[in-house]
């Protein structure tokens, strides 16, 4: 067949070539596809077309006829193939002034292309491309009508109105030579009812009158129709005036008066256009859309509005333009923007640039978010280069970051790393968002030789950043950093806080460990076989690290239960509980009881195995959050090891599929750690956990109530950061398991010792007055209030607290022993929390040991073998827990019967203390599940009496359990006898009671000492040092410094210089 094709070309001047070629195709139908493709290739060769054109002006028409004939002769599959690689793929590149038969080709193919091509939308996109090209060549072939008809049929068969709408609009816009369909034009396109358009314009006019109250007498409804004329691209002012006066039938004076109103509303912009001899032009602004969007919503049909919003909405169009605007100014090193550049732009880009300049100055957060989004889309969403750096033998260093000079060829390149995640570090970085550089070059006389050009750049963490220079885009001078324009309400530079996850990757077949920086990591799986796509970079020391872009798990490791049991027993353990403690909770060895145990850890592990509890949301009462149960809660002052105790739980992942999810890093700033069936979540302070699964632990006193109490109106508005918006309608916000020893919630700068002192006050009114005075002092220190205003706000806060905690009202106030009060005060929480622990305070000597231990653990983390070994073992423990959670286990008959008897006895005991049935049922379920968990941890197939006894022991280690043992020792003794366990007679000198009393006594002594120090400083006002206070009161410097810091937080003293204190 080549000879026929070549013959056609060589003899193209022969007038019979068309007839000759068609006859040959009929003679060899099996090769028609090959002939057609070759003819197509010839047809697209510019040199060939040029040569053919010299011989015969009709050559392209002849080739077009051959093309159409071959299409009609081809079978369906070949036509699809030819169409895919033919006309639509290269249509925009055709010299259309030569192809006289292109219209016929499009028309003939349209009849079947939508039904026979696999993806009709692909054809639509090609038609759009071809249509744009034809429109540019002024080839009016009424493509919109053709496409509209075909898509009407498509709509009838496939119910695909979206494609009809999109393609029809596209070609109609091209055909009408109007490429700027604004939102209002789109509205008019969808609304054909003139009365509806009239009504819409009336409402726009009413909105203008409402916004501009000083013009109440001016009826803007008369001129609102001008917005059907205006576009973003603008039009000459004189042409607009003539057109508007003609359509509105009003005088020029009235129109100009209303234009003045619209300009003050920033709905229009009138300025000179340098491209048109500085003639005045009038433009429609984006603010117009923002102000009337709710009106448009009323008139656009829902589906049409969604389509129009997705395609032509003002802000969407603006964001697309801004994205392109930003992309053009991005470099791999960062983002650069010259403020003065806007004035040099033209057309629509100038409008976008001006908007972006305004956005930078007025809404820098939004502008920076957009820059970062574009940056990551541009540089962090491309296919990884196939550079295998795993097998390089230059990786010999055993440090976290490796100096490998031979890696220079891979620096700043996208690479693929394959290995295991050997550890995770979470922290938050804060840095200024933007920096401003101004071209200022002062001579000796103080005159500026610079051009005052301003350049805004993203902050770059370079050394000596104040001296960091860039080139002026105007005059080429070196310009320095100037004070940032972008400041918050307090005048401080706006900073960008970024949650940063650092994953430690263990490369395969090597012993090397590298840092992987991930700017946003919703989920990382420990020790999964992963592929990390990242850019290899170096820091200023020449050390290599990976700026990770993505982490993709490669496979799931299967768990062998029998092998794990053998491993535990071979290691000398009779159960998995002790094995897990030693492998996972090695960091909390310092927090042990006198027997060298930590029952809290036992509880946490067993609770981790349970899957029974959850939270539900009660939406019927003002949208308030109502937890059904919280499994475990700790109570204690700062620094008592609560976070240190539970942090290792992050290593006990629940499932292999969704092992760990970290929403907020940095343990110091957390309100709690929530364990659910599928994930582990960290929550930032002040935030109510929005999790439908069960929380196990919530800790720390933060600033929630104080922050809300400062501005109750702000709470109503729902704008308070960190407050769940469904709570905004009321003040009675239930705190989920936070600080229940006062039943209040989180209060800033108050620790447990202060609160005990407040609660020792006799009588409700005295307590209330003490709380009001305390908050008033706080508000005076933290805000610019006078005394009366601070007291009024403090009263609102206290009333808010009392309203949210009915157990603190006057009728419930107890004047008996502190333990009675504690039990009564805990009732608000104990109906939902079976396990509550009171952590004892530690002495300075204890903390020295804990800090030393923590330091050793930190050093050990840097040892690769230690990281790998410990994390592998933690991972195996996680898989074991995940496995036994789903493993069913039954009670032995005697154990089940005994458990029922225990429940009956315990129910009577709880009823004496006013705990309702619902709580009792949940508690018994917990004991039952805990007994099963203990049996599973001991690799048993059935639950026996020993497991029931272990579950009871854990429960009676809690505050409520201890108090029940103190109040009713005989009944508790009877309960333990049922499971064959003897307990000592519980007297007032019970060990647990002594610890609680010791805590209370220490709290009283410290509070008394704090008052004495403050009174002494007030009576002898001067500047004191910490050493002076320590010597005067015969206490250690650490204790004195701690008390002085508390007084400083409360606003009683200030701190003029380091380690100096002055009474206020």
UniProtKB/Swiss-Prot annotation:
Gene3D superfamilies, per the entry: P-loop containing nucleotide triphosphate hydrolases, Winged helix-like DNA-binding domain superfamily/Winged helix DNA-binding domain
Keyword Cell membrane: no
Entry-linked InterPro entries: P-loop_NTPase (IPR027417), WH-like_DNA-bd_sf (IPR036388), WH_DNA-bd_sf (IPR036390)
Assigned keywords, A-Z: Plasmid
Protein name as annotated: Uncharacterized protein MJECS08
């Amino acid at each position: 067949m080549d000879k026929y094709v070549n013959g056609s070309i060589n003899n193209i001047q022969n007038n019979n070539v068309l007839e000759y070629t068609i006859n040959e195709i009929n003679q060899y139908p099996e090769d028609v596809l090959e002939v057609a493709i070759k003819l197509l290739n010839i047809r697209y060769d510019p040199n060939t077309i040029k040569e053919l054109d010299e011989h015969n002006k009709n050559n392209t028409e002849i080739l077009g006829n051959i093309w159409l004939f071959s299409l009609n002769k081809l079978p369906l599959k070949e036509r699809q193939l030819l169409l895919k690689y033919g006309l639509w793929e290269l249509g925009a590149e055709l010299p259309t002034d030569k192809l006289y038969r292109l219209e016929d080709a499009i028309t003939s193919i349209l009849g079947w292309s939508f039904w026979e091509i696999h993806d009709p939308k692909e054809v639509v996109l090609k038609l759009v491309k071809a249509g744009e090209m034809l429109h540019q060549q002024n080839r009016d072939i009424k493509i919109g009508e053709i496409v509209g008809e075909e898509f009407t049929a498509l709509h009838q068969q496939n119910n695909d109105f979206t494609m009809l709408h999109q393609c029809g609009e596209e070609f109609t816009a091209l055909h009408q030579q109007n490429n700027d369909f604004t939102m209002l034009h789109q509205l008019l396109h969808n609304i054909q009812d003139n009365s509806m358009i009239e009504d819409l314009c009336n409402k726009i006019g009413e909105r203008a009158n409402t916004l501009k109250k000083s013009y109440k007498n001016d009826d803007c409804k008369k001129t609102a129709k001008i917005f059907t004329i205006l576009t973003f691209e603008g039009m000459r002012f004189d042409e607009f005036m003539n057109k508007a006066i003609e359509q509105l039938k009003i005088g020029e004076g009235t129109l100009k008066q209303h234009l003045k109103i619209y300009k003050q509303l920033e709905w229009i912009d009138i300025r000179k256009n340098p491209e048109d001899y500085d003639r005045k032009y009038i433009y429609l602004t984006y603010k117009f859309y923002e102000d009337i969007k709710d009106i448009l919503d009323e008139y656009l049909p829902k589906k049409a509005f969604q389509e129009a919003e997705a395609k032509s909405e003002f802000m969407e169009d603006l964001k697309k333009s801004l994205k392109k605007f930003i992309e053009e100014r991005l470099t791999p090193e960062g983002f650069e923007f010259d403020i003065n550049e806007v004035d040099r732009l033209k057309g629509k880009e100038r409008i976008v640039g001006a908007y972006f300049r305004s956005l930078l100055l007025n809404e820098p957060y939004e502008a920076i978010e957009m820059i970062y989004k574009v940056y990551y889309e541009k540089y962090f969403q491309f296919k990884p280069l196939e550079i295998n750096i795993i097998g390089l033998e230059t990786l010999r260093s055993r440090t976290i970051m490796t100096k490998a000079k031979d890696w220079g060829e891979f620096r700043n390149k996208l690479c693929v790393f394959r290995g295991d995640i050997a550890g995770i570090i979470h922290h938050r970085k804060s840095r200024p968002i933007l920096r401003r550089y101004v071209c200022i070059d002062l001579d000796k006389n103080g005159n500026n030789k610079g051009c005052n050009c301003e350049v805004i750049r993203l902050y770059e963490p370079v050394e000596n950043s104040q001296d960091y220079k860039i080139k002026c885009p105007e005059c080429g001078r070196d310009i320095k950093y100037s004070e940032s324009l972008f400041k918050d309400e307090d005048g401080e530079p706006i900073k960008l806080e970024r949650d940063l996850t650092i994953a430690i990757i263990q490369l395969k077949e090597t012993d090397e460990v590298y840092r992987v920086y991930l700017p946003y990591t919703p989920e990382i799986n420990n020790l999964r076989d992963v592929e990390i796509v990242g850019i290899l970079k170096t820091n200023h020391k020449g050390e290599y690290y990976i700026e990770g872009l993505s982490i993709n798990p490669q496979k799931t490791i299967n768990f062998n239960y029998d092998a794990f049991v053998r491993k535990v027993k071979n290691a000398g353990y009779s159960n998995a509980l002790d094995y897990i403690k030693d492998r996972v909770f090695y960091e909390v060895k310092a927090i042990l009881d006198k027997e060298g145990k930590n029952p809290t850890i036992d509880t946490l592990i067993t609770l981790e195995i349970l899957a029974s509890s959850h939270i539900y949301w009660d939406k019927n009462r003002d949208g308030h959050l109502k937890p059904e149960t919280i499994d475990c809660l700790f109570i204690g002052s700062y620094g008592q090891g609560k976070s240190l105790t539970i942090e290792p739980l992050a290593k006990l992942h629940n499932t292999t599929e969704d092992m760990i999810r970290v929403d907020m890093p940095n343990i110091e700033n957390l309100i709690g750690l929530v364990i659910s069936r599928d994930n582990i979540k960290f929550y930032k302070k002040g935030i109510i956990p929005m999790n439908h699964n069960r929380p196990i632990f919530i800790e720390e006193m933060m600033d929630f109530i104080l922050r809300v109490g400062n501005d109750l109106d702000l709470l109503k508005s729902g704008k308070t950061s960190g407050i769940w918006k469904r709570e905004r309608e009321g003040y009675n916000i239930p705190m989920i398991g936070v600080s229940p020893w006062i039943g209040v919630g989180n209060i800033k700068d108050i620790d447990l010792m202060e609160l005990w002192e407040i609660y020792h006050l006799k009588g409700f009114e005295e307590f209330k007055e003490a709380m009001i005075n305390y908050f008033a002092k706080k508000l005076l220190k933290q805000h610019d209030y006078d005394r009366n205003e601070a007291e009024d706000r403090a009263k609102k806060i206290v009333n808010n607290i009392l309203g949210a905690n009915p157990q603190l009202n006057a009728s419930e106030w107890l004047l008996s022993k502190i333990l009675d009060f504690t039990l009564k005060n805990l009732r608000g929480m104990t109906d939902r929390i079976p396990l509550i622990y009171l952590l004892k305070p530690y002495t300075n000597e204890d903390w020295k040991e804990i800090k030393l231990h923590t330091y050793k653990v930190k050093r050990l983390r840097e040892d690769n073998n230690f990281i790998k070994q410990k994390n592998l073992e933690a991972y195996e423990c996680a898989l074991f827990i995940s496995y036994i959670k789903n493993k069913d286990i039954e009670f032995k008959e005697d154990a089940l019967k005994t458990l029922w008897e225990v429940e009956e006895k315990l129910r009577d005991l709880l009823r004496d203390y006013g705990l309702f049935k619902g709580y009792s049922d949940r508690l018994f379920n917990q004991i039952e599940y805990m007994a099963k968990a203990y049996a599973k941890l001991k690799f048993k197939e059935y639950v026996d009496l020993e497991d029931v006894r272990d579950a009871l022991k854990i429960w009676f280690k809690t505050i409520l359990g201890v108090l029940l043992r103190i109040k009713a020792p005989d009944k508790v003794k009877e309960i333990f006898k049922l499971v064959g366990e003897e307990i000592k007679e519980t007297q007032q000198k019970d060990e647990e009671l002594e610890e609680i009393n010791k805590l209370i006594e220490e709290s009283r002594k410290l509070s008394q000492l704090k008052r004495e120090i403050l009174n002494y400083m007030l009576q002898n006002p001067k500047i004191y040092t910490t050493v002076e206070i320590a010597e005067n009161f015969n206490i250690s410097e650490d204790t004195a410094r701690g008390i002085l810091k508390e007084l400083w937080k409360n606003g009683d003293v200030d701190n003029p210089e380091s380690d100096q204190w002055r009474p206020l």
